[in-house]
Amino acid sequence: MTANVSGIGSVLQQMQAMAAQASGGVASPAAALAGSGAATAGTFASAMKASLDKISGDQQRALGEAQAFEVGAANVSLNDVMVDMQKANIGFQFGLQVRNKLVSAYNDIMQMSV
């Protein structure tokens, strides 16, 4: 249960960093991600890869926990499974929206005349 609370705290910290960046409080996205521990290098590619790896890891962990619950493991409770599944879903939806924004920005740039 303590891991879930610290996980929620981590997600909250990332959301606050993104909100600060959106309002102009943080100079760059790399600085916002570095504060949350998501990216160690300052490049966009490394930040994107770290985010995708985290999303994939969350999904794999949630799936493993769900399978453990299904076979009746004593140390896995239903509420932990549900919370981890929702965290994985939210992470995936966030990644999907980031991808959509990147594609939209790319299309806008491609339509600009030089």
From Swiss-Prot:
Keywords associated with the record: Bacterial flagellum
Keyword Transit peptide in annotation: no
Any Pfam family matching the protein: FliE
Predominant subcellular localization, coarse grouping: other
Keyword Transferase in record: no
InterPro entries in UniProt: FliE
GO biological process, one term: bacterial-type flagellum-dependent cell motility
Domain of life: Bacteria
GO molecular function: cytoskeletal motor activity; structural molecule activity
GO cellular component: bacterial-type flagellum basal body
Localization, UniProt: Bacterial flagellum basal body
Family (UniProt): Belongs to the FliE family.
NCBIfam families named in the record: fliE (TIGR00205)
The protein's name in its UniProt record: Flagellar hook-basal body complex protein FliE
Source organism of this protein record: Burkholderia multivorans (strain ATCC 17616 / 249)
